[in-house]
């Protein structure tokens, strides 16, 4: 098993990327790590070269670069070289903490879409604070600002596969993010998508879900268009972090009694903080392309990088991409019928 690593992508690259890879190497001795990066920056950081190979590159795609132009012009960048290694079969998966748009472009245009998937989407696992399971799949997080009803329908299929193969959730409960629970809510795209998903035999669709219910455990897969999904994700993350901050401030301002109570509650707050910590969860996955492609937060540190390697390992071992490819090929008539509903 080989993972191609964009060693130069991210706010703390290459130092935290290399540290994370070395942690992962010690955890997962069956993985070979291909580090793509600037030799003079990466080489001094590697303490032990076992199961690690450096492939020197001369360019870096910066966070502010225009994604498609950067992918096309910076052909010797760490990200593009890593993507091409996956395309050529020299690696099984691609990891980056760099420019999200450029990674999406590299995944779609270099590694390529699975035949039959119209729009690959960005998915992540978010915590559930109630219900049967600890996590749920949320997608699209912004790969596609606009979506057709058939795209949302396909996301239900992709998300269900990720839930079963990676999160271990069989017969995942799928819901559509909308501005109300009733069937007739939303714009025309969401109304059509609701009907397509309701009539589908490909997954277990339970109807709409509102953004306020995202963390309540009522779904194992929540499907959204990229604009709404990205906005809901950032609002949820921001609200959760602000609430924890406000609770901490309130405890510190209530005198000795409040501080004593806060000490008693500290383990509970740590558990909540851990569930909300992206360093624990791994990265966001580009579903619908021909290999696992995973993006961690730009500010991710070594532990987040290492945890993401475990996530990628599971995707490969569970045959996530081959199983999606087979299912899409076997159900092409059903997918075409969904497009014809537009």
Curated annotation (Swiss-Prot):
It comes from the Bacteria. GO terms for cellular component: cytoplasm. It catalyses: a fatty acyl-[ACP] + phosphate = an acyl phosphate + holo-[ACP]. One of its GO terms (biological process) is fatty acid biosynthetic process. It is found in: Cytoplasm. GO terms for molecular function: phosphate:acyl-[acyl carrier protein] acyltransferase activity. Pathway: Lipid metabolism; phospholipid metabolism. NCBIfam families: plsX (TIGR00182). Catalyzes the reversible formation of acyl-phosphate (acyl-PO(4)) from acyl-[acyl-carrier-protein] (acyl-ACP). This enzyme utilizes acyl-ACP as fatty acyl donor, but not acyl-CoA. This is Phosphate acyltransferase. The lineage of its organism: Bacteria, Bacillati, Bacillota, Bacilli, Lactobacillales.
